[in-house]
Regions:
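N-terminal glycine-rich phosphate-binding loop for ADP-containing cofactors
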Residues: 1-304
Length: 306
């Protein structure tokens, strides 16, 4: 199949969406980055006001360390907008990547809009961390389902090489082959073909590991520093160890993936490992989600309150 990617639409400008946009811009692809209309800007006619949410997210990504861009000038390849005013522009892109919040109902609402404006043959994929791909494809047009799959990037996408490609039973095999090839040759990824099982491969293993550590921590009354000292380079793992990794990934993402596995794998022999400690749920309730909110595991001032 001869297919080229000249322009990509990224739907959702959070930590992952903004950085995926930067990664594509870094390889010379034009990017349309869309998110919700900025709160309180419903009556404004000024794009600057209506796009404040997405613009602020992109600027935060550009200023982050390590940088998501090879060179700062590549940011000029990213055009921002919002779902209300600019969703029609996805008719002019070659690939639509959905990166909105990890809730199936919200993702389906976004796909309703995508179906209104997407031209036939355009690739569509989800960056979900663990929601079953086939649930997002249900009820969609035949052409949508044929060109739809999961493409799961990892944070930060410029530096983490893994890209999981997750087709459904209705995904055209040629589309799967294209994603595997494009991810390898153009995005610089190690592409891994996954079955559409809860949390796929990396998060099924990684979140199991993290949740196991949390339960052991409770049982043995270990501190965050003790866990970090044990589960980092001492074990042959990155220095981000357990809790710094959780802060980067997003504690809300960790919770949603763990809860999703517990709900969708009732017969899994390790199901109890994915049970959430009460203090972890309290962190999410307090909006202590890691780097994205500026408060997570690595702030002793607040984690001591748990």
């Amino acid at each position: 199949m001869q297919r080229s990617i000249k322009k990509v639409a990224v739907l959702g400008s959070g930590v992952m969406g903004s950085r995926i946009a930067c990664h594509f811009a870094g390889i010379g692809v034009e990017v349309l980055l869309l998110d919700m209309l900025s709160p309180g800007a419903e009556q404004s006619k000024l794009p600057k006001e209506r796009n404040k949410l997405v613009d602020n997210s992109l600027q935060a990504a550009i200023k982050s360390n390590p940088s998501p861009l090879y060179l700062q000038k590549f940011a000029s390849s990213i055009t921002t907008g919002n779902f209300t005013d600019d969703m029609n522009k996805i008719a002019n892109v070659d690939w639509i990547i959905e990166v909105v919040v990890e809730r199936l109902d919200i993702k389906k609402l976004i796909y309703d809009q995508v179906e209104q404006y997407r031209k036939p043959g355009t690739l569509v994929s989800s960056n979900t961390s663990g929601i079953p791909i086939h649930l997002m494809a249900e009820g969609r047009s035949e052409d949508f389902q044929k060109h739809f799959c999961g493409t799961h990037f990892f944070n930060p996408p410029r530096y983490l090489r893994l890209l999981e490609v997750i087709p459904t039973a209705t995904t055209d095999p040629a589309i799967v082959d294209f994603h595997m090839h494009y991810g390898d040759v153009f995005l610089g990824k190690t592409t891994v073909l996954c079955k559409d099982t809860p949390a796929f491969i990396a998060n099924r293993v990684g979140v199991f590991s993290m949740m196991s550590v949390l339960h052991i921590m409770e049982k043995l009354a270990l501190s965050i520093d003790e866990i970090e000292a044990i589960t980092g380079p001492l074990m042959g793992r990155p220095k981000s160890a357990t809790f710094r990794t959780a802060d980067v990934v997003g504690i809300d993402t960790l919770v949603k993936v763990a809860a999703g596995v517990a709900a969708n794998c009732p017969n899994d022999e390790a199901k109890n490992i994915f049970t959430l400690p009460a203090w972890l749920e309290k962190m999410v309730a307090n909006n202590w989600l890691g780097d994205k909110t500026g408060q997570g595991f690595r702030s002793e001032e607040h984690t001591s309150e748990l």
